[in-house]
Amino acid sequence: MAEGQVLVLDGRGHLLGRLAAIVAKQVLLGRKVVVVRCEGINISGNFYRNKLKYLAFLRKRMNTNPSRGPYHFRAPSRIFWRTVRGMLPHKTKRGQAALERLKVFDGIPPPYDKKKRMVVPAALKVVRLKPTRKFAYLGRLAHEVGWKYQAVTATLEEKRKEKAKIHYRKKKQLMRLRKQAEKNIEKKIGKFTEVLKTHGFLV
């Protein structure tokens, strides 16, 4: 990957810990990483057990002054961010710099809605979990422990998908017209095409 290039990952369908481990390694190596659709991240194990674990974590606080921490994030993006932070030496300068190279989002906000998103096969739920194993959605867990924007994120995602469908339809139409135009002019420019091919400009 070129220096300064941003790696945009789609979190949907990935396992929380596995994706976090890979992201942590990449940011330590100096790459900028953006993770979108964090609400679609999966956690292995059934939902009820995961919820009990998170509720137990919510009870961890400083008795004399809870505002001093630990801080319990409710948004899926922040839960994922905290998971990555736990895999970094975040109290050192190197770890802090690595953490600054990571951006996390619920849904797919602009400008990332127009960028190509990648997946990490080593962290995909369909690759890593047996089909019979239970799993939970991070978005649902977050919603049940206090995240208020599940409905808003879902609405914005629907709007984005509709826009993407329209854009894809237009793109297909343009490609069809281009092919037709090439066919129409093929006989006229045939000899020029042959010359370009002999010189290696066309394959």
Curated annotation (Swiss-Prot):
Q: What is its main location?
A: cytoplasm
Where N-acetylalanine occurs, residue numbers? A2
Keyword flag Calcium: no
Does the UniProt entry include the keyword Metal-binding? no
Residues modified as N6-acetyllysine are: K191
Q: Which domain of life is it from?
A: Eukaryota
Kindly list the positions at which Phosphoserine occurs in this protein. Answer: S77
A GO biological-process term: translation
Q: Where in the cell is it found?
A: Cytoplasm
Residue positions of the PTM Citrulline?
R59, R140
Please outline how this chain is modified post-translation: Phosphorylation at Ser-77 upon interferon-gamma treatment in macrophages involves a DAPK1-DAPK3 kinase cascade and is causing release from the ribosome, association with the GAIT complex and subsequent involvement in transcript-selective translation inhibition.
Which UniProt keywords are listed?
Answer: Acetylation, Citrullination, Cytoplasm, Phosphoprotein, Ribonucleoprotein, Ribosomal protein, Translation regulation
Gene Ontology MF term list: mRNA binding; structural constituent of ribosome
Instruction: Provide the transmembrane region boundaries.
Output: none
InterPro entries cross-referenced by the UniProt entry: Ribosomal_uL13, Ribosomal_uL13_CS, Ribosomal_uL13_euk/arc, Ribosomal_uL13_sf
Annotated GO CC locations: cytosolic large ribosomal subunit; GAIT complex; ribosome; synapse
Subunit details:
Component of the 60S ribosome. Component of the GAIT complex. Interacts with EIF4G1.
According to its UniProt entry, the function of this protein is described as: Associated with ribosomes but is not required for canonical ribosome function and has extra-ribosomal functions. Component of the GAIT (gamma interferon-activated inhibitor of translation) complex which mediates interferon-gamma-induced transcript-selective translation inhibition in inflammation processes. Upon interferon-gamma activation and subsequent phosphorylation dissociates from the ribosome and assembles into the GAIT complex which binds to stem loop-containing GAIT elements in the 3'-UTR of diverse inflammatory mRNAs (such as ceruplasmin) and suppresses their translation.
Homology family:
Belongs to the universal ribosomal protein uL13 family.
Alphabetized HAMAP family for the sequence: Ribosomal_uL13
Q: What is this protein called?
A: Large ribosomal subunit protein uL13
What's the encoding gene here?
A: RPL13A
